[in-house]
Amino acid sequence: MIKVEDILRAYRHGFFPMADSREGTVSWCQPYQRAVVPLDTFRPSRSLRRVIDEGQFTIKTNTAFEKVIRACALPRAVEKETWISEEIIEVFLKLHRLGLAHSVESWQNGELAGGLYGLSMGGAFFGESMFFFERDASKVAFAWLVGYLRKKGFSLLDAQIMNPHLESLGAIEIPHEEYMLRLEHALAKKIFFI
């Protein structure tokens, strides 16, 4: 069973958990190339800007954390397995109750339409996963998160492992050594998400 202290220690040292749903195991990952979103240069695409300006979604934080993490854990059309196991869900629910894990939610007509969750430590936000039930809902939540982190003075938005979706949102890859320097700088900040 993963403990809260295990998660906090691992993230401070550049590791994060991934479950293998077939094996029922959890591995600790520390990729050589780390995906991060540069907070100072992120700009939503024109099409996303239009969706944001239309006000299709209402953004809320931490009102449906468990719903968000469980939606993120659902298998995707292209991936039949999920890396978010019940063990990971349980420890992140504890982290949420401690005020360390947070959800950003897009709501539409009173229904949860999409969102994301992650872990906040110092000036670092570790984006864990995102999901959507309605088109662009997770992207709107992501754009809101970036703006919010900027305003609060965060310096690191860790996206962990690059994929085409993250790249389309402006994520870049940096070498492990550079990531660790950025992480150390971010963790030294006295910032709280809420």
UniProtKB/Swiss-Prot annotation:
Pfam families per the UniProt record, alphabetical:
Leu_Phe_trans
**What top-tier enzyme class does this entry carry?**
transferase
The EC number on file is 2.3.2.6
Q: Does the keyword Acyltransferase apply?
A: yes
Q: Which GO terms describe its cellular component?
A: cytoplasm
What are the protein's GO molecular function terms? leucyl-tRNA--protein transferase activity
A biological process (GO) of this protein is: protein catabolic process
| InterPro entries, A to Z | Acyl_CoA_acyltransferase, Leu/Phe-tRNA_Trfase, Leu/Phe-tRNA_Trfase_C
Where does the record place it? Answer: Cytoplasm
- Which UniProt key words apply to this protein? Acyltransferase, Cytoplasm, Transferase
Instruction: Give the reactions, separated by semicolons, that this protein catalyses.
Output: N-terminal L-lysyl-[protein] + L-leucyl-tRNA(Leu) = N-terminal L-leucyl-L-lysyl-[protein] + tRNA(Leu) + H(+); N-terminal L-arginyl-[protein] + L-leucyl-tRNA(Leu) = N-terminal L-leucyl-L-arginyl-[protein] + tRNA(Leu) + H(+); L-phenylalanyl-tRNA(Phe) + an N-terminal L-alpha-aminoacyl-[protein] = an N-terminal L-phenylalanyl-L-alpha-aminoacyl-[protein] + tRNA(Phe)
The main place the protein resides is cytoplasm
Function as written in the Swiss-Prot or TrEMBL entry: Functions in the N-end rule pathway of protein degradation where it conjugates Leu, Phe and, less efficiently, Met from aminoacyl-tRNAs to the N-termini of proteins containing an N-terminal arginine or lysine.
- Return the similarity comment: Belongs to the L/F-transferase family.
Q: HAMAP family of this UniProt entry?
A: Leu_Phe_trans
The protein here is known as Leucyl/phenylalanyl-tRNA--protein transferase
What is the organism of origin for this protein? Chlorobaculum parvum (strain DSM 263 / NCIMB 8327)
